[in-house]
């Protein structure tokens, strides 16, 4: 736990990352995600920028900066070790004592995460990022979601499975199977210590960009306005319940699940409760959560595509004001 951060190695990794950032400029999906986060979250919010940095912040890195960050953030008092596999508690403690027993924090104070407030609600708006000649339009629709600690977590999971969280979801069935606009469409809540984004997304043919938006917003409205059928609800709940075992197939997966419990301060018997609580979700629960969290009138819509071809049709829809922007790089 005493990395040297040699100048040459830091420079090599920095230059590699800068090259990756340049490559992102040619990746519409990456541009859409960067633009979406920057537009949903205000500049002072930690989710406004990519966790992997941008060109300016990356170019400024040197070994002293990296070492200072390490010493302030990676400290014994802030560290939890998860061990899985064919090993006893006694053996694990002995190994940790051998390799980490002498670890002491560097001098100086711990890093302090500045407080952040939830982004304010704002009227829906469409932002276009120009990619001339693009055969497809990359669509991101959504806004701030919820914290992992939200009391309706299980209902949210069921609701999103219905909307866009599985292959048989409404968004994928409509946009892929029925309309043939895309190879896949979906949605999801990003659970984080602060409310991460809710995003519905797809990459669609350029000529059906406006038509795809119509279908997205139709599905949002349907989920809010109508009770889901018993058959569809049972299918979504079974999808989540039966999929749980697949999250524990390897020791790495077991460690990841335990780490999630620790990160979000969940009880160690959380997974004993998971299936019963998922199966207890009702159609009324789903509609109530949809009305609270699926709010199209406040959504940010980001589309990366050929602006000259897609803008007229989107403006004719009248779903929200339209502006052209760029993705932060």
Question: Which residues does each predicted region cover?
Answer:
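Divalent metal-coordination and catalytic microenvironments
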Residues: 17, 66, 81, 141, ...
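Non-catalytic beta-strand/loop surface segments
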Residues: 11, 23-77, 102-150, 161-211, ...
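Short hydrophobic/aromatic beta-strand micro-patches
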Residues: 82-84, 201-203, 302-304
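Hydrophobic side chains in well-ordered alpha-helices
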Residues: 92-95, 171, 212, 289, ...
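Short beta-strands and strand-coil junctions in structured, solvent-facing domains, enriched
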Residues: 2-7, 89-90, 102, 106, ...
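Non-catalytic, conformational "gating/processing" segments within enzyme and secreted inhibitor domains
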Residues: 63-99, 297-300
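Small-residue-rich helix-loop
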Residues: 221, 228, 234-241, 245
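A common structural junction motif
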Residues: 1-5, 99-107, 218-228, 317-327
């Amino acid at each position: 736990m005493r990395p040297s951060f040699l100048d040459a190695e830091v420079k090599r990794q920095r230059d590699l990352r800068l090259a990756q950032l340049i490559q992102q400029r040619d990746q519409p999906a990456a541009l859409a995600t960067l633009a979406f986060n920057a537009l949903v979250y205000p500049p002072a919010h930690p989710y406004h920028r990519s966790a992997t940095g941008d060109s300016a912040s990356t170019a400024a890195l040197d070994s002293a900066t990296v070492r200072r960050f390490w010493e302030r953030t990676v400290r014994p008092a802030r560290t939890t070790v998860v061990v899985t596999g064919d090993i006893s508690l006694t053996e694990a403690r002995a190994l940790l004592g051998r390799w980490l027993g002498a670890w002491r924090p560097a001098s100086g104070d711990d890093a302090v995460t500045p407080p952040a407030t939830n982004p304010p609600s704002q009227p829906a708006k469409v932002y276009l990022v120009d990619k001339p000649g693009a055969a497809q339009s990359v669509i991101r629709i959504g806004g701030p979601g919820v914290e992992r600690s939200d009391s309706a977590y299980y209902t949210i999971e069921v609701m999103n499975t219905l909307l866009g969280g599985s292959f048989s979801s409404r968004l994928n069935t409509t946009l892929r199977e029925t309309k043939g606009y895309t190879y896949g469409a979906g949605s999801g809540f990003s659970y984080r210590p602060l409310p991460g984004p809710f995003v519905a997304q797809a990459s669609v043919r350029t000529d059906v960009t406006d038509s795809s938006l119509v279908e997205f917003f139709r599905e949002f409205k349907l989920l809010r306005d109508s009770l889901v059928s018993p058959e569809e609800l049972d299918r979504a709940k079974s999808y989540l319940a039966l999929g749980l075992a697949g999250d524990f197939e390897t020791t790495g997966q077991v460690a990841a699940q335990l780490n999630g419990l620790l990160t979000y301060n969940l009880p160690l018997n959380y997974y004993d409760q998971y299936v019963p609580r998922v199966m207890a979700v009702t159609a009324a629960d789903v509609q109530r959560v949809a009305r609270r969290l699926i709010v199209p009138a406040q959504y940010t819509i980001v589309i990366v595509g050929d602006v000259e071809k897609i803008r007229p049709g989107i403006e004719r829809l009248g779903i929200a004001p339209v502006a052209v922007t760029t993705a932060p790089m």
